From Swiss-Prot:
UniProt GO cellular component terms: cell surface; extracellular region; host cell membrane; membrane
Function: Component of the type III secretion system (T3SS), also called injectisome, which is used to inject bacterial effector proteins into eukaryotic host cells. EspD and EspB are inserted into the host membrane where they form a pore and allow the translocation of effector proteins into the cytosol of target cells. Necessary for intimate attachment to epithelial cells.
UniProt membrane topology term: Single-pass membrane protein
Transmembrane portions of the chain: 99-119
Family to which the UniProt record says this protein belongs: Belongs to the SctB/EspB family.
Keywords: Host membrane, Membrane, Secreted, Transmembrane, Transmembrane helix, Virulence
Subcellular location field: Secreted; Cell surface; Host membrane
Disulphide linkage map: none
Entry keyword Manganese: no
Protein name: Type 3 secretion system translocon protein SctB
Subunit structure of this chain's protein: The core secretion machinery of the T3SS is composed of approximately 20 different proteins, including cytoplasmic components, a base, an export apparatus and a needle. This subunit is involved in the formation of a pore, called the translocon, in host membrane.
């Protein structure tokens, strides 16, 4: 059995402790107090010592692997929570966009219905006004026509009566003049009466002409009122609403299409962001795995170097013994 003195073993253990890293020094420091099972008559069993050191190294590597795996699992849980939060935000945005689209469609439909109701109301009001104006104009025209007809008939009757009276008076005057020249005073009275009747007929004709002129002026005023109605603001508003009704469906369809395009772009940008975050997470996981593999290789190399050092120390101790 290969053994060395206690002093040489203490020197070898101290050199091993000084050559290892901080993580291994704390572990191997506990081996400085060698159990009594490794001591044989004041000497140390090198083989058992090497086995204990290898066990400690394996435990150290296992502990480090467990720690790194826990760190990786914790990082994965964090990334998973982030992704779930992003997915929840995406779902909420999609739901909000859908609700906004539905609300916009409902508002558009209500606006269309309101516009049609306003147009119908304005059209009905305009038609009522036009009908009332037409009825008033027709009544006025009928009144004027009737008054003109009556006035003309009255004037004609008056003129005819006057002519008849004048003719009768003239006949009577001629007859009276022919029968008796002595009745000059009676003829003069008849002539005066005829002249008075003629003047009355002339006055009635003048009144009829004046009334006809008044009716003609009333007709011209109604014609001007109809022209003002056609050029008034309500009439222009109704015309504008009728023209706007033609372009309203096109405007609504363009608005809905624009909202749909905006929602699609927003969803696409969110999906691109999620894909970018997933790629970043995969790269982080790959770097962490590479780092773990590199550290494990370094630890394996360190353990191999330590084993070689201990073997050389054992060989040196055997040669010295």
């Amino acid at each position: 059995m290969n053994t060395i003195d206690n002093n040489n073993a203490a020197i070898a253990v101290n050199s091993v402790l000084s050559s290892t890293t901080d993580s291994t020094s704390s572990t191997t420091t506990s081996t400085s107090s060698i159990s009594s099972s490794l001591l044989t008559d004041g000497r140390v069993d090198i083989s058992k010592l090497l086995l204990e050191v290898q066990k400690l190294l394996r435990e150290m590597v296992t502990t480090l692997q467990d720690y790194l795996q826990k760190q990786l699992a914790q990082s994965y849980d964090i990334q998973k929570a982030v992704f779930e939060s992003q997915n929840k935000a995406i779902d909420e945005k999609k739901a909000g966009a859908t609700a906004a689209l539905i609300g916009g469609a409902i508002s558009s439909v209500l606006g269309i219905l309101g516009s049609f109701a306003a147009i119908n109301s304005a059209t009905k009001g305009a038609s009522d006004v036009a009908q009332q104006a037409a009825s008033t104009s027709a009544k006025s025209i009928g009144t004027v026509s009737e008054a003109s007809t009556k006035a003309l008939a009255k004037a004609s009757e008056g003129i005819a009566d006057a002519a008849d009276d004048a003719a009768g008076a003239m006949q009577q005057t001629i007859a009276t003049a022919a029968k008796a020249a002595s009745r000059t005073s009676g003829i003069t009275d008849d002539v005066a009466t005829s002249a008075q009747k003629a003047s009355q007929v002339a006055e009635e004709a003048a009144d009829a002409a004046q009334e006809l002129a008044q009716k003609a002026g009333l007709l011209s005023r109604f014609t001007a009122a109809a022209g003002r109605i056609s050029g008034s603001t309500p009439f222009i508003v109704v015309t504008s609403l009728a023209e706007g009704t033609k372009t309203l469906p096109t405007t609504i369809s363009e608005s809905v299409k624009s909202n749909h395009d905006i929602n699609e772009q927003r969803a696409k940008s969110v999906e691109n962001l999620q894909a970018s975050n997933l790629d970043t997470y995969k790269q982080d996981v790959r770097r962490a795995q590479d780092d773990i593999s590199s550290r494990l290789r370094d630890m394996t190399t360190t353990a191999r170097d330590l084993t070689d050092l201990i073997n050389r120390m054992g060989q040196a101790a055997r040669l010295a013994g």
